Curated annotation (Swiss-Prot):
It comes from Citrobacter koseri (strain ATCC BAA-895 / CDC 4225-83 / SGSC4696). GO terms for molecular function: cadmium ion transmembrane transporter activity; manganese ion transmembrane transporter activity; metal ion binding; symporter activity. The gene is mntH. Pfam families: Nramp. Its main location: membrane. This is Divalent metal cation transporter MntH. It is found in: Cell inner membrane. It comes from the Bacteria. NCBIfam families: nramp, Nramp_1, PRK00701.1. Keywords: Cell inner membrane, Cell membrane, Ion transport, Membrane, Symport, Transmembrane, Transmembrane helix, Transport. H(+)-stimulated, divalent metal cation uptake system.
Length: 412
């Protein structure tokens, strides 16, 4: 009886610790449902129905492993990826890493900020510039939570992630996808033509985000409570839950686009405005409004995460610190310039995703090298099969992104 009570007490303590350590992966997972994903998934679903859902499944599994490795680096070494690169690489390499990471963080933020501004424009019927002003104000308010520590911010970002997931449950109810075809699309790989291959590469390229790899290792480096193994076990649960939610959202985006657009003959839907305006007559005003709200929530939360990632990159690589509000003000400027110049926001969004692809390998390669180093990682070092899978992901992602860049440059 006493043993049962002790086991029950230790079980409760383990669950309590696991809950206390939950949160960092929810911040990281937001990077996987940003407006870039909206645009890519909607285009893929409208063009090819359910046939590319399997790409989302595999991209999400790869992203899960990458985020576990990033989180594990922070737990094992109490340093984030940027700090490890600073400590182990020559100074010119470190400066190169810092500059490219800042450029990529700003390019990512451009897509996320404009995505939220488009969302405000669609649901409120205002101009894109007014939407951008609202986005700026909202992100400043969310970032103010950082003054109270990491936990309040984790709760707000986690809440926004759950809101987007709930919004897409509603969208699935409105669009009523075929469950048999949906399941088939998730399980059976299919690439009908060269455009499908290009879109599949785009889905994978938009899924793995370099700035979130840097950020996740910083969110776990100061975790306390329990042993390293217990923190790592709790982190795996954190990643599994958060990334499963993000994966569901991506699947639901593509499935909704397939059910609403592809099978009604609207296969040419390629931007967010079109998607919103077409949803209203096809499904209902409520469905279009829910889409707009989910775009705002995803854009706001991901642009906040992008600002935090930029701060981690600067502090980690060059030990330089600026207040978050200053960084937010600076990184908003490109978005306002794009809007004031009257450039096509969806085209800018796609171009920013292409620029982002340059940074994926630069973040993944050192992450794999460091997490495979026993002197750094101790008992949390990568197993042999994790190394093999990790390098296979690197080769695949790099090859697909090079192919995407070449295709984009040649206008394929």
């Amino acid at each position: 009886m006493t043993n049962d009570r002790v086991e029950s007490s230790s079980g409760r303590a383990a669950r309590k610790l696991r809950l206390a350590l939950m949160g960092p992966a929810f911040i990281a997972a937001i990077g996987y449902i940003d407006p870039g994903n909206f645009a890519t998934n909607i285009q893929a679903g409208a063009s090819f129905g359910y046939k590319l859902l399997w790409v989302v499944v595999w991209a999400n599994l790869m992203a899960m492993l990458i985020q576990v490795l990033s989180a594990k680096l922070g737990i094992a070494t109490s340093k984030n990826l940027a700090e490890q690169i600073r400590d182990h690489y020559p100074r010119p390499v470190v400066w190169f890493y810092w500059v490219q990471a800042e450029i990529i963080a700003m390019a990512t933020d451009l897509a996320e900020f404009i995505g939220a501004a488009i969302g405000f424009k669609l649901i409120l019927g205002i101009s894109l510039l007014q939407g951008a002003v609202l986005t700026g104000i909202a992100t400043f308010l969310i970032l103010m939570l950082q003054r109270r520590g990491q936990k309040p911010l984790e709760k707000v970002i986690g809440g926004l992630l759950l809101f987007v997931a709930a919004a897409y449950i509603v969208e699935l109810i409105f669009s009523q996808p075929s469950l048999a075809q949906l399941s088939k699309g998730m399980i059976i790989p299919s690439l009908p033509n060269s455009e499908a291959v290009f879109l599949a590469a785009g889905v994978l390229g938009a899924t793995i985000m370099p700035h979130v790899i840097y950020l996740h290792s910083s969110l776990t480096q100061h975790l306390h409570g329990g042993s390293r193994q217990q923190r790592y076990a709790a982190t795996k649960w954190d990643v599994a839950i958060a990334m499963t939610i993000a994966g569901f959202v991506n699947l639901a985006m593509m499935a909704t686009a397939a059910a609403a657009f592809h099978f009604s003959g609207h296969t040419g839907i390629a931007d967010l405005d079109q998607a919103y305006l077409t949803l209203e007559p096809l499904l209902s005003h409520a469905a279009a409004t829910v889409f707009g709200l989910s775009l705002v929530a995803a854009g706001l939360s991901s642009t906040v995460v992008g600002t935090l990632a930029g701060q981690v990159v600067m502090q980690g690589f060059v030990r330089f610190h600026i207040p978050l509000w200053v960084r937010r003000t600076i990184t908003m400027m490109p978005s306002f310039i794009v809007i004031l110049m009257g450039l096509d926001p969806t085209r800018i969004l796609v171009m920013s995703q292409v620029l982002l692809s340059f940074g994926i390998a630069l973040a993944l390669v050192p992450l794999l090298i460091f997490t495979s180093d026993r002197t750094l990682m101790g008992d949390l070092v990568n197993t042999q099969w994790v190394k093999y899978i990790g390098w296979m992901i690197v080769v695949l992602v790099v090859a697909l992104n090079i192919w995407l860049l070449v295709g984009t440059a040649l206008g394929l």
